[in-house]
Amino acid sequence: MLAQREVVALVHDAVNLEGIAFTFPEIQTLLDGVTVGGHKLSDQQIAINQAKAWKQLFSDLKQNNFVLTAEYACKLHSIAAKEDALEWGKFRTSGVTIAGTEYLPPAADRLAQLFAEMVDRVTMQNDIYDQAISLFLQMARTQFFYDVNKRMGRFMMNGHLLNQGYPVINLPAARQLEFNQLMLDFYQTGEEEQMK
């Protein structure tokens, strides 16, 4: 699986999209088990969690254990969001907001149903890339978790692609400003076309 060789790039871009400024060599060093000076421990933990979540995803894909379910998303979230989110490994239990937009994600008591509906809608689309991108977007917009929603959307999107024999989609950190603006517009409208 080619994506396994790209873990450093995937982690680098993911943390930088979250506003955590690590260079590529710093991520390489950190993932080799050496701490990097000048960074908060919490930021380093986020990067390490990303790498661990990728390893788990690759392992699950090899063993045919990747599934588009709420349970699987929560399992992966327990790794990706450990000590980063208010709670990890389960859907949020109260309301959240998204900075920069007036859009309010759905109430917490609807999340399990919304996840199942999202998977049904996504898998009805013909194009595998449209399915994957829609999965990412809807996970980010619905905010199933207190935090780490976009990262989880990327994991589930890429797990779905890899499971179908397609390469991953990596969102380059160099396009952070454009990505953030498009996401804010998407949160407000729910219209996916601009993002595909």
Residue ranges and their predicted role:
Residues 1-196:
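FIC/Doc superfamily catalytic core
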